[in-house]
């Protein structure tokens, strides 16, 4: 009887280990889908004047960042508060890389909680709104069992767009 219980317990543990990556990826996709729905609804519910104001504030932030001095620790912080930029819908934007089937939300910062579930925007780099002399730096994990994120980024080439 004890051997049977031990064998069953080992089987359950083995099954759990085998299913963990699949279940983790499904939960991650559900999380990203929920954020996309929320983000899209928030954008649609926000009037054009507010969206324009958010974009202009982000462009002003980028302009100040372009003129900031660089020290050993990175760019000096511009006067506008980073966390107040691009705040509609809980995500800053989305990164879309069709070649590797990636469409992920971009969150403020690169803390552990952010990078566990999504792409993080590196503080001190341009906000992802485009423009001259702007270079937004994004960060995400690759090779995680619980989420794909940037796992296939090594398949990209210099000519690929995103």
Enumerate the language-model features and the residues they cover.
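Solvent-exposed, non-transmembrane regions of membrane-associated and secreted proteins
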Residues: 4, 10-161
């Amino acid at each position: 009887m004890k051997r049977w219980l031990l064998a069953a317990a080992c089987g359950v543990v083995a099954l759990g280990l085998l299913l963990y990556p699949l279940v983790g990826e499904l939960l991650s996709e559900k999380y990203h889908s929920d954020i996309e729905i929320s983000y899209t609804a928030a954008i649609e519910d926000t009037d054009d004047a507010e969206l324009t104001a958010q974009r202009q504030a982000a462009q002003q932030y980028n302009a100040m960042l372009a003129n900031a001095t660089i020290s050993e620790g990175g760019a000096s912080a511009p006067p506008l508060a980073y966390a107040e930029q691009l705040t509609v819908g809980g995500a800053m934007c989305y990164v879309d890389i069709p070649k590797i089937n990636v469409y992920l939300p971009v969150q403020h910062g690169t803390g552990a909680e952010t990078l566990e579930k999504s792409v993080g925007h590196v503080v001190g780099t341009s906000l992802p709104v485009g423009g001259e002399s702007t270079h937004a730096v994004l960060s995400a994990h690759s090779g995680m069992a619980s989420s794909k994120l940037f796992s296939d980024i090594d398949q990209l080439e210099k000519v690929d767009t995103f």
